[in-house]
Amino acid sequence: MDGREAMAFPGSHSQFYLQRGVFTNLTPSQVASGLHAPPPPPGMRPMSNPNIHHPQASNPGPPFSMAEHRHSDFGHSIHMGMASPAAVQPTLQLPPPPSEQPMVKKKRGRPRKYVPDGQVSLGLSPMPCVSKKSKDSSSMSDPNAPKRARGRPPGTGRKQRLANLGEWMNTSAGLAFAPHVISVGSGEDIVSKVLSFSQKRPRALCIMSGTGTVSSVTLREPASTTPSLTFEGRFEILSLGGSYLVNEEGGSKSRTGGLSVSLSGPEGHVIGGGIGMLIAASLVQVVACSFVYGASAKSNNNNNKTIKQEIKPKQEPTNSEMETTPGSAPEAAASTGQHTPQNFPAQGMSGWPVSGSGSGRSLDSSRNPLTDIDLTRG
């Protein structure tokens, strides 16, 4: 308020002048006349127009009421009421205290797959394990229940599968398979060339195929090894096959087996059978493979074991000789009569006459300085 303001009250109540919290009591007659009003207290100005009437003077109301509108920033309101000019009672309404939530510390790192209450936090459905628990409980309750065997089931190995075909198939499994290409020149015998190649090593040889032309072929009967028919001309090799296996009873170069061939003549006739001799008309290439089967592999292992056993006894004396001390070497040489590099025999000295034992001793004593040295002296 600037200066003072006049507030009129209905009825016979007096009018008050407000100036910064200071109230002045005036009668209605004084307010109406405006002339007989007592002088204002020092520091207060009189009203410029005393005939101003407050519009609320005609309306009956409470003796005194002041209200402030609720501010948007405050959640409470202030009400002031006065039944009389001397009674003023302010009322305050405080808002309820806000509820505090517990502080939760943020966890760092990768989220856990399983939360502490047992639920899956990543949305993964757990595997049902009821059947496994039931099986375990049944096996624990029943001690006579058969236990599950560990390892490979019996009868599923390679040897067991080969045993169904017979003992020969079980022992003839090849090892160290190696392919070969045999070249046969013009005019050479293909059979003799392949047989000599198989005799170089104690390995079985299997003929896979052959390509080229031949000028002469000698066929033999199946039941005998002697040739029976001979064909001459130019023939194309259609197929060539056979094998040479090592004969253990006949030696390392003894072989069992043979070759068979199918040839096509110039007119389209096909001849073939077991061959005794096959002469090449041009370069012929034979594809073969060699391998070591069970019998020869066992013999090779036995030979290696015997060789190792022979080598070990020879190495033991050398180790014992290296352990002898150098101080005992001269005494051992003198006791056994071994000749050192400085002790030469009398027979080896040609040109020196040997008449008796005395001259021989003098020669030995002059040549061997070890006899004059006393090893016990310092």
From Swiss-Prot:
Coiled-coil intervals:
none
Pfam families in alphabetical order: PCC
Q: Where is this region: Disordered?
A: 30-70, 88-160, 302-378
Q: Which Gene3D superfamilies match?
A: Hypothetical protein, similar to alpha- acetolactate decarboxylase, domain 2 (3.30.1330.80)
Q: Where is the PPC domain?
A: 171-314
Q: Where is the composition biased (Polar residues)?
A: 316-327, 335-345
Query: Does the keyword field hold Lipoprotein?
Result: no
> Could you tell me the keywords of this UniProt record?
DNA-binding, Nucleus, Repeat, Transcription, Transcription regulation
- The answer on whether this UniProt entry bears the keyword Kinase reads no
Q: Which PROSITE patterns match?
A: PPC
- InterPro entries from the UniProt entry: AHL (IPR039605), AT_hook_DNA-bd_motif (IPR017956), PPC_dom (IPR005175)
The sequence motif named Bipartite nuclear localization signal is recorded at 105-113
Cellular location(s): Nucleus
Q: Where is the composition biased (Basic residues)?
A: 104-113
Cellular compartments per GO CC: nucleus
Q: Mind listing the GO molecular function terms for this protein? A: minor groove of adenine-thymine-rich DNA binding
Task: Locate the DNA-binding region by residue range.
Answer: 105-117, 147-159
Q: What is its main location?
A: nucleus
Its UniProt domain note says:
The PPC domain mediates interactions between AHL proteins.
Function description: Transcription factor that specifically binds AT-rich DNA sequences related to the nuclear matrix attachment regions (MARs).
Q: How does it assemble?
A: Interacts with AHL29.
Protein name per the record: AT-hook motif nuclear-localized protein 5
Q: What gene is behind this protein?
A: AHL5
